[in-house]
């Protein structure tokens, strides 16, 4: 089972990143996910993905509706995709406390109960708040996450507000909530991968997202972290998921580039770890080429 924790389909050009070309909509996303991607000599697809709007589309613009209506508007296309392709897309609710912390918490609960959302996204840089100081802004949503076992994905890797350790106060206050350190603490403006690593080492409810991590570092970290502590996420688009799958596949090779990881361990990293966290049925790696080819259409082909 391959599950991407970090996808951004959109039906309009992103307000912040302003990627050129046509919008990277759900259908383009599915085509990208279908690959196929060669993993240890077998063709694979990304079976499922957690989807969220591009963060630039979740801030207030003149003319937007306010409060819960505005939140529902920026989540509308993601909600539509989760209902149109329920076997491929899982909802990730973007929580912007500047629309009102209680409004966001109520909308999170609505999306969980009505549409099966299983994840929440925090992006303190894009939404402009200090996570270590704005605890009253975060608590309402975290209480909902605790109630419904919603996993929290945190954008990290650049200042001023998304250095990983700035989230320690809320993480420690909610030990019953699982947190993913997005990008393994790395962005174009910073590298906090060792902070992310030590947070995952020291804190039971923290795991790290593989995407953006340097290849030479992820093998170093994977050797020391418990196997359940790494999940696969690509931040696509603009990233291309094949390179991040290859980064994990390399762990199956001998040292120093790899760590002789077995295929079951690789499958945990690529999808089964996040599946267990979110209550999704897991699947073992395909044993044969024929089984792998069947899995390109049916994620559970050959699974008892």
Can you describe what each PLM-predicted range is?
Residues 24-37, 72-79, 104-108, 163-168, ...:
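Alpha-helical scaffolding within the catalytic cores
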Residues 4, 50-53, 94, 181-183, ...:
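Short beta-strand segments
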Residues 19-20, 27-66, 89-96, 118-119, ...:
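Divalent metal-dependent hydrolysis catalytic cores, especially in the metallo-beta-lactamase
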Residues 62-153:
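Active-site gating/metal-coordination segments in enzymes
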Residues 1-10, 14-48, 227-229, 240-304:
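Mid-to-C-terminal alpha-helical segments outside catalytic/metal-binding sites
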Residues 18-24, 57-59, 66-71, 96-104, ...:
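Acidic-and-aromatic substrate-binding clefts and catalytic sites of carbohydrate-active enzymes
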Residues 6, 33, 78, 82, ...:
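Conserved, mostly hydrophobic/aromatic
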């Amino acid at each position: 089972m391959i599950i991407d924790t970090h996808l951004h389909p959109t039906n309009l050009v992103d307000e912040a990143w302003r990627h050129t070309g046509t919008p990277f909509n759900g259908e383009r996303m599915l085509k990208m996910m279908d690959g196929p991607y060669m993993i240890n000599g077998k063709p694979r697809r990304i079976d499922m993905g957690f989807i969220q709007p591009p963060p630039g589309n979740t801030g207030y613009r003149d003319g937007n509706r306010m409060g819960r209506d505005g939140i529902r508007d920026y989540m509308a296309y993601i909600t539509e995709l989760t209902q149109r392709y329920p076997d491929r897309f899982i909802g990730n609710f973007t929580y912007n406390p500047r629309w009102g912390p209680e409004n966001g918490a109520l909308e999170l609960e609505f999306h969980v109960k009505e549409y099966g959302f299983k994840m929440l996204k925090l992006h303190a840089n894009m939404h402009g708040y200090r996570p270590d100081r704005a605890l009253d802004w975060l608590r309402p949503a975290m209480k909902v996450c605790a109630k419904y076992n919603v996993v929290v994905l945190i954008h990290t890797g650049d200042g001023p507000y998304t250095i990983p350790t700035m989230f320690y106060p809320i993480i420690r206050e909610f030990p019953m909530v699982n947190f993913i350190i997005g990008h393994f603490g790395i962005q174009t403006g910073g590298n906090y991968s060792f902070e992310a690593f030590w947070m995952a080492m020291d804190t039971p409810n923290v795991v790290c997202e593989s995407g953006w991590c340097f290849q030479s570092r992820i093998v170093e970290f994977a050797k020391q972290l418990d196997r359940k502590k790494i999940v696969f996420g690509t931040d696509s688009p603009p990233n291309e998921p094949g390179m991040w799958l290859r980064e994990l596949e390399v762990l199956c090779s001998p040292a120093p580039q790899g760590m002789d990881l077995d295929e079951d361990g690789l499958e945990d990293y690529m999808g089964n770890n996040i599946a267990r966290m979110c209550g999704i049925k897991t699947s073992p790696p395909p044993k044969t080429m024929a089984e792998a080819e069947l899995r390109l259409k049916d994620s559970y082909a050959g699974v008892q």
